[in-house]
Amino acid sequence: MHRWSRLFVPTLREAPSDAEVASHKFLLRSGYIRQLGAGIYSYLLFGQRSINKIVGIVREEMDKIGQEFLLPAIHPADLWRESGRWTVMGDNMFRLKDRKGAELCLGMTHEEVMTDIARNELRSYKQLPQIWYQIQNKFRDEPRPRSGLLRVRQFLMKDSYSFDLNQAGLDKSYDLHDAAYRAIFTRCGLNFVVVEADSGAMGGSGSQEFMVYTDAGEDLIASCAKCGYAANMEKATSKLAPVEELAATGDGQPELISTPGQAAIADICKFLGMQPHSDIKCVAYMAEVPSEDGKTSTWEPVAAFLRGDHFVNETKLLAVVGATELRPMQAEELEKWMHGPAGYLGPVGLTPAKKLRDGSLNVVLDLGLEGRRNLVAGANKLDYHYRNVTPGRDFTWTVAADIRNAAEGEGCPVCGEPLKVAKAVEIGHIFKLGTKYTESMGARVLDENGKEVMPVMGCYGIGIERILTASIEQNNDANGFWLPRSIAPFDVVVTITNMADETLRQAGEALAAQLEAAGYDVLLDDREERAGVKFKDADLVGIPYRFNVGKKTLEGKTELVTRATASSQDVALDAAVEALKALTA
């Protein structure tokens, strides 16, 4: 058993002013963590005990399907150049040089390192499949660290990598991870949902995220209550309801009209008496496109066109264009590529690239504009718009694709029922990478026929601290939070209300010893503090059960409190262990 009087648990009555989300506030107030710098945290006793329990669960489930490794946190730049990601990762990667000038980085992820082991050690199909995992610190140069442990610069991850002979083998490894993740998050007591996701810089095809709904989340999830469809907003699609088209004016051809001072969509809609869905919105970007070898990159112009009531999904647009970063066009770039000022941009008269990334203007049309007619668009001229604009007749594009955010109330892409959109935090992610890394890094094995083939890869990640954070977000009230027994720093706290009373002290000591003998992880609150202080601390720090050893103990009873429900029951001292077993069975 642990004695609170001997522990360092620096609880706070008030959260620091810069703590915004509930989990951040309570992690600080409960003494789980302390901040060292922006996005950099120290884990104190209670925090580390919870992290250790989470790691234990993850390790138990991963050992059922894979083998644990531990890889370096410092990587040579050349390894990342081989995969092409030295450029792709941009400013998110911590980069450094050693005293000899060799370029290095702090690992954000370990696909390259694992693939390097595979290409040097795997020779035959007989050595496949392989699943290798590690639990290791990762580093990311977050531009705006925030929300406590949700957006940090150093974080603990379980990352695993599978190597299979073919796609069928990858599917099996992927399914093994899916089952393992469900077991892990269930054992950690989380209410989670599995959603379709974008692969991003990881590459590959299939991708799913494991998400926990919370207002502190930075992701948006679109879901359907009827059929179960769920997807991250970066991936979500929807069915659009038909909209009424504007009547054509004049001869029905594009008509240049004066619209002085009507740069905003809301203004032009009011000025012309129309709805935003009849406007063509233009969002102009410069996109950073990496070279094939990943060593260099160029900036290419992109004009995205979509309905005036829709919003660009930049993740989708990046994927369509094959870029790593987007930034808005500056005034001189607008003049060069769009031949007009912001607020009056439109597609009529533009010369789109014949194919993506050929150095000319990449015009991307959202699918929501296909088949529309008699729309209003900027004329690429200050204070002027066109009306009667019909896509395909009056302008062309380089590529048409889904580049918009799905919105609440739009139709589910599977069954058509209205979608719901809610915030969530990602706790795990699984990817089917394919041969992206084995091809670029030259990993080969001989198949059954003696032919060289590239192993097919998957990668799979779990954010360890995010499990703790998500649990606190799901389980808190005004007084603090409670954790599931499986990941709480202690299973139960025995609170002696008056240490000056020898009878109570002995009863508390005896009860704590009995609970420990029964297999519980016990904290004995033997501090020389008022009972009220002890109760407040116990409510704050996440321990799921509490025995109060107080006045009723003189009658042979103790009060058993369940933190999650704030319910209590009086039980006989000699039946206390059995009472707790009944609650934790």
Curated annotation (Swiss-Prot):
Enzyme Commission no: 6.1.1.15
What this protein is called in its record is Proline--tRNA ligase
MF GO annotations: aminoacyl-tRNA deacylase activity; ATP binding; proline-tRNA ligase activity
- Transmembrane regions: none
Pfam families on file: HGTP_anticodon, tRNA-synt_2b, tRNA_edit
Q: Which InterPro entries match?
A: aa-tRNA-synt_IIb (IPR002314), aa-tRNA-synth_II (IPR006195), aa-tRNA-synth_II/BPL/LPL (IPR045864), Anticodon-bd (IPR004154), Anticodon-bd_dom_sf (IPR036621), Pro-tRNA-ligase_IIa (IPR002316), Pro-tRNA-synth_IIa_bac-type (IPR004500), Pro-tRNA-Synthase_IIa_type1 (IPR023717)
* UniProt GO cellular component terms: cytosol
Tell what the record comments on domains: Consists of three domains: the N-terminal catalytic domain, the editing domain and the C-terminal anticodon-binding domain.
User: What family is it from?
Assistant: Belongs to the class-II aminoacyl-tRNA synthetase family. ProS type 1 subfamily.
* PROSITE patterns the UniProt entry points to: AA_TRNA_LIGASE_II
HAMAP family on file: Pro_tRNA_synth_type1
Q: Does the keyword Aminoacyl-tRNA synthetase apply?
A: yes
UniProt keyword annotations, A-Z: Aminoacyl-tRNA synthetase, ATP-binding, Cytoplasm, Ligase, Nucleotide-binding, Protein biosynthesis
Which EC main class describes this enzyme?
Answer: ligase
Reactions catalysed, as given in the entry: tRNA(Pro) + L-proline + ATP = L-prolyl-tRNA(Pro) + AMP + diphosphate
Its annotated function is as follows: Catalyzes the attachment of proline to tRNA(Pro) in a two-step reaction: proline is first activated by ATP to form Pro-AMP and then transferred to the acceptor end of tRNA(Pro). As ProRS can inadvertently accommodate and process non-cognate amino acids such as alanine and cysteine, to avoid such errors it has two additional distinct editing activities against alanine. One activity is designated as 'pretransfer' editing and involves the tRNA(Pro)-independent hydrolysis of activated Ala-AMP.
- Alphabetically, which GO biological process terms does the record hold? prolyl-tRNA aminoacylation
* Compartments, record wording: Cytoplasm
Indicate the quaternary assembly.
Homodimer.
